[in-house]
């Protein structure tokens, strides 16, 4: 079953290539959507794909790249829309 997840990652997650690594990991898991920095220092993302693939990407976000220090991940699940053709970094 395909799903959508709106994700917010908190901690030291900006300035450590978190978005780029998230994009690369999403592509490995065949997840589409976007990721972007927020003004409060967090990173937000919208992930769409097969439930297991989205769950795997969310699990990866709980650790992030080695240079990141993730303190928490908030997830809000929603209905799959299919609006994304790829996974990109939003600004």
Swiss-Prot record:
UniProtKB keywords: Hydrolase
EC number: 3.6.1.7
Cited Pfam families: Acylphosphatase (PF00708)
Recorded GO MF terms: acylphosphatase activity
Active site: 19, 37
Enzyme class: hydrolase
Keyword Endoplasmic reticulum: no
Reactions listed under catalytic activity: an acyl phosphate + H2O = a carboxylate + phosphate + H(+)
All residue ranges annotated as the Acylphosphatase-like domain in the record: 4-91
Xref: InterPro entries: Acylphosphatase (IPR020456), Acylphosphatase-like_dom (IPR001792), Acylphosphatase-like_dom_sf (IPR036046), Acylphosphatase_CS (IPR017968)
NCBIfam families: PRK14438.1
Family under the similarity heading: Belongs to the acylphosphatase family.
Protein name in the entry: Acylphosphatase
């Amino acid at each position: 079953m395909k799903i959508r997840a709106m994700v917010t990652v908190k901690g030291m997650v900006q300035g450590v290539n978190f978005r780029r690594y998230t994009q690369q990991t999403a592509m490995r898991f065949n997840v589409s959507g976007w990721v972007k920095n927020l003004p409060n220092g967090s990173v937000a993302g919208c992930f769409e794909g097969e439930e297991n693939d989205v769950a795997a990407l969310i699990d990866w976000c709980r650790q992030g790249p080695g240079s990141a220090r993730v303190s928490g991940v908030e997830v809000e699940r929603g209905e799959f829309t299919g609006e994304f053709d790829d996974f990109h970094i939003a600004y």
